[in-house]
């Protein structure tokens, strides 16, 4: 039975109401510092921990709760007579409920003007110590680290005579150990990323020890293949506009491949300012277009490769209205992603309950790093978020691209970044015309892109081509020109750049270099 609670929180969300409910149930309240003042100002009967222990706070508040009367009351096992006799001998009452959350270390180091001294002062000592003590003794002590659990604890107490059951106590304890592990991980990441202890850590510095923390969203039916198990985890600091913020409106449970492909589609479509549509198959764009609205963009994107679009993932950067919904509903679609769906669009898909509708608010946030597991290790790199501006482009051929060609080149370059290497993308008039992806040789990607356009009945005459990396030889360039391209955008940087540029001049086309490569594996 919960008779006494100790409350000490940095995040004071809902704490006054929670403490009042505890007091109404006859629970004695202990507290520290600012939390004690807040509760007292609210008219609640509360005892300061310093008065309770008979020992004042000291060292500018660094020592408040590190006292045997606190930790003895938390750690004593109620089922062991010798523990209870020790408490009685030393005049220590039990503490049955601990409500603690920690100094805001992560929020502190996120500030641009944070110094090492600021960070150090926001490393909580007493809080984690109490939390771990209570979580260790969860058979006898209820421990709450998350304000979202206040209601759960109160409901159980009211239903069971001020008692919280073991299943809930165990769940709350595991939550505590996860929280303190994440907290210590953040401290380790920060301190080991400092190049000089007198300076603030550079955000581009990789820590000597890397701790990662994610919360499980759900178990998945299976992994990339049916014989593989899988689960989906969400970053604790999910950036605005990230896929993990999705809200599923309808449809079957998401699979591993659904989530992976949806991320590829969403990241690509977010980069466009105009209404855009991206169709993804096996993590590669098979159709991308901008248009007057979502329906127009979809119609153009679908034209690129209707065969591959079957069973694909489709993303929009504008609301899906009735017209767009009716167009999409004619095809077999696995997942549809958009910032919003009109009521009329939802009605259209209500007749297709297997279609998964994901709603995600637009945002320009991105993961800070890309992670890739290798045998026994982890590759970590900054995100490829580089978007080349027109002013950075360098025309290296005798012929300058026209204004229309430049628009097509920039569109093609934006798409190529999201195509698996080696990537060749034909574009024109705000849409992809042919996509060659994932080939071991660039010339084969060029041939495949040309064949794709041919199969879709699309002309490549006057088209623009983007290559995610340089042309190592002129053969790839010869293929795209033979298909009808009149301008090319590529990074440059090959030992044979001069030969490739000479070939472009020989063909009378325009070539633009970005100086930026977009390998994607």
From Swiss-Prot:
Pathway: Purine metabolism; IMP biosynthesis via de novo pathway; 5-formamido-1-(5-phospho-D-ribosyl)imidazole-4-carboxamide from 5-amino-1-(5-phospho-D-ribosyl)imidazole-4-carboxamide (10-formyl THF route): step 1/1; Purine metabolism; IMP biosynthesis via de novo pathway; IMP from 5-formamido-1-(5-phospho-D-ribosyl)imidazole-4-carboxamide: step 1/1. SMART domains: AICARFT_IMPCHas, MGS. One of its GO terms (cellular component) is cytosol. It catalyses: (6R)-10-formyltetrahydrofolate + 5-amino-1-(5-phospho-beta-D-ribosyl)imidazole-4-carboxamide = 5-formamido-1-(5-phospho-D-ribosyl)imidazole-4-carboxamide + (6S)-5,6,7,8-tetrahydrofolate; IMP + H2O = 5-formamido-1-(5-phospho-D-ribosyl)imidazole-4-carboxamide. It comes from the Bacteria. One of its GO terms (biological process) is 'de novo' IMP biosynthetic process. Keywords: Hydrolase, Multifunctional enzyme, Purine biosynthesis, Transferase. One of its GO terms (molecular function) is IMP cyclohydrolase activity. Coiled coil: none annotated. The IMP cyclohydrolase activity resides in the N-terminal region. Belongs to the PurH family. This is Bifunctional purine biosynthesis protein PurH. It comes from Burkholderia orbicola (strain AU 1054). The gene is purH.
């Amino acid at each position: 039975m919960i008779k006494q609670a100790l409350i000490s929180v940095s995040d004071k969300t809902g704490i006054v109401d929670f403490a009042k409910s505890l007091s109404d149930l006859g629970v004695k309240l202990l507290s520290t510092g600012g939390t004690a003042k807040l509760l007292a100002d609210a008219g609640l009967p509360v005892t300061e921990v310093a008065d309770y222990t008979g020992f004042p706070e000291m060292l500018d508040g660094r020592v408040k709760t590190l006292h045997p009367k606190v930790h003895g009351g938390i750690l004593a096992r109620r089922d062991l007579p010798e523990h209870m006799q020790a408490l009685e001998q030393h005049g220590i009452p039990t503490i049955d409920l601990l409500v603690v959350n920690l100094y805001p270390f992560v929020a502190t180091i996120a500030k641009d003007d944070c110094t090492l001294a600021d960070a150090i002062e926001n490393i909580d000592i007493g809080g984690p110590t109490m939390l771990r003590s209570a979580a260790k003794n969860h058979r006898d002590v209820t421990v709450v680290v998350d304000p979202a659990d206040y209601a759960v604890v109160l409901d159980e107490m009211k239903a069971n005579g001020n008692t919280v059951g073991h299943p809930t106590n165990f769940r709350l304890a595991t939550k505590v150990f996860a929280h303190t592990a994440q907290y210590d991980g953040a401290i380790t990441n920060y301190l080991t990323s400092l190049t000089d202890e007198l300076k603030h850590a550079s955000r581009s510095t990789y820590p000597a020890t890397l701790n990662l923390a994610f919360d499980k969203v759900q178990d998945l039916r299976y992994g990339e293949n049916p014989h593989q198990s899988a689960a989906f985890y969400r970053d604790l600091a999910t950036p605005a506009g990230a896929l993990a913020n999705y809200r599923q409106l309808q449809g079957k449970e998401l699979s591993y491949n659904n989530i992976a492909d949806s991320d590829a589609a969403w990241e690509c479509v977010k980069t466009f300012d105009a209404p855009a549509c991206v169709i993804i198959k096996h993590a590669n764009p098979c159709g991308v277009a901008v248009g007057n609205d979502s329906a127009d963009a979809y119609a153009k994107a679908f034209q690129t490769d209707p065969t591959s679009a079957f069973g694909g993932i489709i993303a929009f950067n504008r609301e899906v209205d009735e017209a767009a919904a009716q167009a999409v509903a004619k095809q077999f679609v696995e997942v549809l992603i958009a910032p919003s769906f009109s009521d009329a669009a939802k009605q259209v898909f209500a007749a297709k309950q297997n279609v998964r509708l994901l709603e995600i608010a637009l945002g320009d946030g991105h993961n800070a790093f890309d992670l890739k597991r290798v045998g026994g290790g982890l590759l970590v790199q900054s995100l490829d978020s580089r978007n080349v501006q027109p002013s950075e482009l360098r025309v290296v051929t005798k012929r300058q691209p026209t204004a229309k060609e430049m628009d097509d080149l920039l569109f093609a370059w934006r798409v190529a970044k999201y195509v698996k290497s080696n990537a060749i993308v034909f574009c024109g008039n705000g849409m992809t015309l042919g996509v060659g992806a994932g080939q071991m040789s660039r010339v084969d990607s060029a041939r495949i892109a040309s064949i794709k356009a041919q199969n879709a009945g699309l002309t490549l005459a006057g088209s623009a081509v983007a290559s995610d990396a340089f042309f190592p030889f002129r053969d790839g360039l010869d293929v795209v020109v033979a298909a009808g391209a009149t301008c090319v955008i590529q990074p440059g940087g090959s030992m044979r750049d001069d030969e490739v540029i000479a070939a472009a001049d020989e063909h009378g086309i325009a070539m633009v270099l970005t100086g930026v490569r977009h390998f994607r594996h």
